[in-house]
Amino acid sequence: MFKYTIKNLLLLLLLSSSFTACSNDDDKDGITNLGISLNVNGNEVSGNEENFFLQIETNGNWNASVADSWCLLSKISGTGNASVIGTVAPNPGEKERSTVITVTVGDKEETLILKQRAQGSTPTFENAGRIEIPKLKGGAMNLAYSHYTTYKNKKTITFSAEYDCTKKHTRWIAFTFYNETSVKNTSRTDAWADDPLIPVAYRTYKDDYNKAGYTRGHLCASEDRVYSKEANKQTFYYSNMSPQIGNQFNGGIWLNMEAKVQSWGKEDSLRDTLYVVKGGTIDDDKILKYVGSGVAVPKYYFMAVLARKNDQYKAMAFFVEHKAYSSYNITDYAISVDELEKRTGIDFFHNLPENIEAKVEETFDKNQWPGL
């Protein structure tokens, strides 16, 4: 028999109790409802022993079962909303395996397929090989995903991200500027919304920021995605927010760094494509504190920028402490990508050929970047 991993179990128990406490009252019309979901991206877990949540939303008596013995549920029956802890045993085989989870309430039945990768395999993320995507941290609690819209009859990435569920904060977001995505066709939408790709238990909300005295600071800025109204709306997902100090950071130095990168995104002489990565530091030793429902407040913020023009590359980065600034010059916070990697522990632009990556990341010449 396999056991729950202690660290994840404690976290899951805490979140389970908070979810159960939010159970809805019985439906006043006497109609029994049933909905189920898993807290893992794509209903897929790693090949190691791992815990997950089965989230059950119902106003009736439910029963749950799993088709295979390598997956166990901590509870198989109950009444009303519940978050059930599931555990999978290691998968030492060479192939992915799957099992069916079934929940019934009266004559209603819902099923989910849970997939488990083979040990040693990497998470499935369709855009992991793109130039702007950093090396993934991976693991079941780090969700890598992309948001898309249809723009000019073409599927277009708004931004990609890796979201840390334990910190309730994005590790990084990444996107590109090129001719079609650097134009302005719309204005700020203020379409604040939950990110549908983040499990409910790990989402953040307005009070997580405002009640703690922070603003909702965009990582992918609203002004970064003004080529399309639908793309701009996606920048207002709460997964794209970070708790930032107000006018003297979010509305000051950070805003000015964003504006500078946006100007480069429009600069035809600088780029065919501009690859941008932004984020706040959320490793344990680089967090100021936690606020609200457990949202990490980064101690530092960063941007990594790579310009490609006629198959020639150059790169630079910004790294800035999260504090109030009364005066500043953003040039003072410009560094090489190599230096940013040392400070953040993130491997940027690793999908470039090694010789190109090494050359562009070790050098930074501010004279190559207009207005810096």
Feature roles, as predicted:
Residues 26-55:
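Beta-sheet-dominated interaction scaffolds and their linkers
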Residues 86-92:
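Short, hydrophobic beta-strand segments
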Residues 53, 57-85:
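Surface-exposed binding patches on compact interaction domains or structured appendages
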Residues 23-29, 98-102, 115-372:
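Domain-level detector for secreted/extracellular nuclease and nuclease-toxin modules, and
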Residues 89, 104-108:
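Beta-strand-rich extracellular modules
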